[in-house]
Design a protein with these regions (language model features):
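Mature, function-bearing regions of proteins
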Residues: 1-234
């Protein structure tokens, strides 16, 4: 799976797609009280060291933010400037997905899906290989795949810093679990890279593509050290 820049509308994840993904999860999970993964999973091992999830959240935010759909979708939103509340909300959601029981994980996923379903608009400028005026929606599958990618790659990398290198067998298991994790977003697993090596090639391709070009609006946003941010940083 290689990075591409699209000039046409991509597949949008709708509520029936999410329902179908949730049905797949319910069919696959044998111990719903243990959630999507369970205590014997590589995922549980990876998220156990305390620094891993917080550091993943920070890196994922930096990797996601330049994408035009995300940069302009958050323009004017409190989430683009009120960093600490957003960080706490994200951490709560991820721990629900990684460690809570299945019903809690699905409920949180549905809430996040509902929030993202409201985010859409037209690009105010040509950027990242997309045309000015092109309609965007936060729940487009190609964007969600990139968001998913920015979560699972830093998780592995930070775990290997704090917990030790994963064996090739564990990497394979981890990626299988990550493909299951994608169902929480309503992503069709057939659209994902087939294995970890293909995933890394996809990730590197997107990271090096025009999609990661930074808009002037994004570059000039206030940051937590700029003195221009309202809310809990002040």
């Amino acid at each position: 799976m290689t990075a591409t820049v699209h000039a046409t509308q991509e597949r949008v994840i709708a509520r029936p797609d999410l329902d179908q993904s949730f049905a797949q999860l319910r069919a696959e999970v044998t111990r719903p009280e243990h959630g999507v993964f369970g205590p014997d999973s590589v995922m549980w091992r990876i998220v156990t060291p305390i620094p891993v999830v917080p550091m993943m959240l920070m890196e994922a935010g930096l990797l996601e933010a330049p994408h035009p759909w995300i940069a302009f979708g958050t323009m004017g939103s409190k989430s683009s400037t009120e960093f600490l509340p957003r960080f706490h909300r994200s951490a709560d959601a991820f721990y629900d997905w990684f460690c809570a029981d299945l019903d809690t994980a699905l409920r949180t996923a549905r809430r996040v899906f509902g929030y993202h379903s409201q985010i859409q608009g037209e690009l105010p400028e040509a950027i990242g290989g997309y045309d000015a005026g092109q309609h965007y929606m936060a729940n487009q599958q190609d964007v969600l795949i990139w968001v998913w990618a920015t979560i699972i790659k830093p998780l592995k990398e930070y775990y290997e810093v704090f917990g030790g290198r994963l064996s090739s067998a564990d990497v394979d298991r981890y990626y299988d679990e990550c493909r299951r994790f994608a169902l929480l977003f309503g992503i069709d697993r057939a659209a994902l890279p087939a294995d970890w090596d293909a995933f890394v090639a996809y990730f590197d391709g997107v990271a090096a593509s025009p999609v990661m070009d930074l808009s002037e609006e994004f570059l000039n946003r206030p940051g937590p050290l700029s003195g221009d941010v309202s809310g809990p940083w002040r």
